[in-house]
C-alpha cells in the first residue's frame, strides 16, 4: 500500500496519493485519476513523452518494477537507461532511475515521482 508523491516545477506543491495494495494501475493512470499533469501523448510506451524520475523513499530495499520491452527500447533510445541498469533491474531487482509513467506499475513501496512538465523532458 504505497504512498506516491508527485513533484514537478509546474505544480504549486507536491501531491501525495495512496495507491491501494494490489492495484495494477500505472503511475500515469493514477496521475490522471488525481489530476496530476504528467504530460503524455500515446499512453502506450511508444512516444516516451511521460518520462519520469523515480526516487524510492522507504527504508526497506527498493524493488525493481518490471520493465516492458517497449519501455526498455525507448529509454535506451533516449539514453536514459544503460544495458547494465536493465540487467540490474532484471537480475538483481535494482530499480532504474528513469521510467515511463504509462508503463510503471508501483509495488508496495513509497516513491517520489518527478516530472518536468515538458513531454519527454529529462528530469
Swiss-Prot record:
Pfam families: Fer2. The keyword Electron transport applies. Residues 2-119 form the 2Fe-2S ferredoxin-type domain. CDD domains: fer2. One of its GO terms (biological process) is nitrogen fixation. The keyword Electron transport applies. Binds 1 [2Fe-2S] cluster. Its cofactor is [2Fe-2S] cluster. Signal peptide: none annotated. Coiled coil: none annotated. Gene3D superfamilies: 3.10.20.30. Belongs to the 2Fe2S plant-type ferredoxin family. This is Ferredoxin-5.
Amino acid at each position: 500500500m504505497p504512498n506516491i508523491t508527485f513533484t514537478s516545477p509546474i505544480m504549486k506543491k507536491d501531491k501525495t496519493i495512496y495507491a491501494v495494495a494490489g492495484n495494477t494501475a500505472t503511475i500515469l493512470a493514477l496521475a490522471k485519476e488525481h489530476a496530476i499533469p504528467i504530460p503524455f501523448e500515446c499512453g502506450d510506451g511508444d512516444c516516451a513523452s511521460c518520462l519520469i524520475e523515480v526516487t524510492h523513499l522507504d527504508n526497506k530495499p527498493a524493488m525493481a518494477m518490471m520493465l516492458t520491452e517497449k519501455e526498455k527500447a525507448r529509454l535506451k533510445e533516449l539514453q536514459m537507461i544503460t544495458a547494465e541498469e536493465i540487467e540490474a533491474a532484471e537480475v538483481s531487482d535494482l530499480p532504474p532511475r528513469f521510467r515511463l509513467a504509462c508503463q510503471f506499475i508501483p509495488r508496495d513501496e513509497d516513491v517520489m515521482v518527478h516530472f518536468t512538465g515538458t513531454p519527454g523532458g529529462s528530469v
